[in-house]
């Protein structure tokens, strides 16, 4: 699956040390939620071991269980575009995703300005 043109062009304009955050919004065909999660879970599990990975949070719309949003932060935008998106562990997800979507996914790229976290037991 191809990256959004804005993500690719932004990567060429940034230095290798700039952090980047992405939001990816996906609207699935009804009944595809379980398959989507089965394909995405190993990708998220593998991503956490990448050296430029900072964090990822998967969200599900409480009003529409077929809508998901992934928030990712990476230490190096160019690495995401040139290396991470082409990792073998993403292949099954990329290959199957188009048939699960009811509309094109929406990708936005952000530059983190501030990060505040509290880590709660049980989350």
Question: What is each of the regions a protein language model found here?
Answer:
Residues 68-73, 101-106, 114-121:
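A general structural signal for short secondary-structure boundary/capping elements
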Residues 27-36:
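Short, surface-exposed ligand-recognition loops at beta-strand->loop->(often short) alpha-helix junctions
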Residues 20-27, 57-86, 123:
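Short, well-ordered beta-strand segments in beta-rich or mixed alpha/beta enzyme
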Residues 6-10, 18-22, 33, 57-60:
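Short acidic/polar alpha-helix capping motifs at helix-coil junctions
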Residues 2-15, 110-123:
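Acidic/histidine-enriched, glycine/proline-rich intrinsically disordered or flexible terminal extensions
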Residues 1-5, 15, 45-46, 50-54, ...:
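An amphipathic, aromatic/His-enriched active-site/gating alpha helix that lines ligand/cofactor pockets
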């Amino acid at each position: 699956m191809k990256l959004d043109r804005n993500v690719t062009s932004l990567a060429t304009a940034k230095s290798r040390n700039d952090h980047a955050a992405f939001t990816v919004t996906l609207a699935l065909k009804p009944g595809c939620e379980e398959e989507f999660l089965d394909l995405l879970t190993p990708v998220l599990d593998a991503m956490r071991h990448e050296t430029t990975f900072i964090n990822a949070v998967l969200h599900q719309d409480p009003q529409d269980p077929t809508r998901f949003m992934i928030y990712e932060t990476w230490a190096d935008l160019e690495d995401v575009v040139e290396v991470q998106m082409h990792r073998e562990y993403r292949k099954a997800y990329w290959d199957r995703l188009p048939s699960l979507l009811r509309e094109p996914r929406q990708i936005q790229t952000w530059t983190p300005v501030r990060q505040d976290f509290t880590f709660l037991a049980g989350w």
